[in-house]
């Protein structure tokens, strides 16, 4: 059993047994009913990527390719355009969060509001981060924050779930490692937990490659970790499943010091990944 599988089962059990019920919940199911959930607060996990510990479960298949494409949409394209996400990456699941009548920051008609990539572009976040790390890798101010109150007031839209990432550099012997800490306000445990984690591992790997560093540790903090009330059957099924006997890891197949903006989604490869099937179905809360 991988570390991710152990943490996954522990969190499911804790939510089901100790979690409390949501109140005044915002999300809705597609039929218009309120999407209530059981949740815990203050979830934390640590993975040492340099030792092959990756935050992806083997208990069900995870759509890692689409997840990584979303990272490129946010941090390379730096846009909120649903047209870019669909036409360039063939990713469609963000359509449920389209904000009608709000154009994208690149002029396209369809957007998710002033969120995610639009905020990255507005503050030139990636270029500033890379410049800081270039000037002084050991500085302690390497922060990506997507929490922009001005943007929230400017347009409607889903406020970012994974909203803050911090980076630190460590030298161990002759090797330099890049660590990352992801902070998330809210996480749908069964659907999005490993998707979000692996997205930001991919971002960590892209930044490390840009400088020719090794990937180090990945820290993951979630303020509200929940399971929706229409997912309890799937939760029980996941607890019953025996994990696959594999050790999945994400590989970025580009040379060291490849420019961040020259890396492509197809440069990533998930190896030794043989998840348990069949896939489970989930009705998303919007």
From Swiss-Prot:
CDD domains in the cross-refs: TS_Pyrimidine_HMase
Organism this protein belongs to: Streptococcus thermophilus (strain ATCC BAA-491 / LMD-9)
InterPro entries: Thymidate_synth/dCMP_Mease, Thymidate_synth/dCMP_Mease_dom, Thymidate_synth/dCMP_Mease_sf, Thymidylate_synthase, Thymidylate_synthase_AS
Entry's family note: Belongs to the thymidylate synthase family. Bacterial-type ThyA subfamily.
Signal sequence range: none
Disulfide linkage: none
Catalytic activity of the protein: dUMP + (6R)-5,10-methylene-5,6,7,8-tetrahydrofolate = 7,8-dihydrofolate + dTMP
Nucleotide-binding keyword on record: no
Name used for this protein in its record: Thymidylate synthase
EC number: 2.1.1.45
HAMAP family cross-referenced by the UniProt entry: Thymidy_synth_bact
